[in-house]
Amino acid sequence: MSAVLVTAREFVGDVIGQEAAQFLRFHASARRGVDPESVHQLRVSTRRLRTDLDFLRSLLDSSWYRDVREDLAWIGGRLGARRDFDVLIAFLEELASTDESLDRSVIFRAETMRDRGRDGVERALGRTRYHKLLVTLIDATLWPPLRDPDVIVRRIILDKLGSSWDKLRLASDTVTNEASDLHRLRIVVKRSRYAMEIASPFLDESRPIVQRLARVQDELGQLHDDVVTCDFVVAWYRSARAARGVDPFDASDAWLNAIHKRGEQRRDLWRAPLAEALVLIDDVSRNSSYLEWSEGEQSI
């Protein structure tokens, strides 16, 4: 069947099925705690599916959407508690490898907290709630819980994509160098990227835009990691548990200087790919052919 005439049943089932496959692929090794990358990929799938379901919400049964999204938020939180410390420790180790004067007690603290997170992941992935979520997602690939299974989705998806572009333009126009602003921009970029990937069957020009948005997301993610690391370092050296014999102010300042030095090298690397993506999006928007209606299409 032509992509133009694909129904909600076919389209939504395929979207959910792709992420359900990722869940199954990485579940076993993530549960055993032997592969940090599996935890990362499982968390990515969780976040991706939540964003995809938000994008497709108008097509989905409302109670199913609400329940599944709640379960995804729950398991995503458990996975995040582990993955955030994997990233934090890798970053701290990278900095410490280039400066032996940096106090390592903060790394030991992060490793202790990561181990606690590992136990939480193993318990969560063994719970009935998670197993039921897997079954629900697998069922949804075959029988998507839709308001109208036979509706033609092309126009609906492209309308939603246009809305995501509007939000991206606004976020780009109003962003400042404040960390909170950059984090919000990253979320908008991520949602726009995923929307582009969902809409790709209807849009030949999606790939170069997706590639540039992925670069923006990665660069902004690095900057956010810097902020999280700074917060962790400051909290540790302000605590009574910080290493004895180490001046907490000197140790904290040394780490913060190292983090800021690396951050300055990357601070503006997201700007060029975002500008390129917006130019490409504007080019597509001016091409009215992708917005033309086909017989049988409607909006929701």
Segments from the language model and where they lie:
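Function-determining surface determinants
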Residues: M1-I300
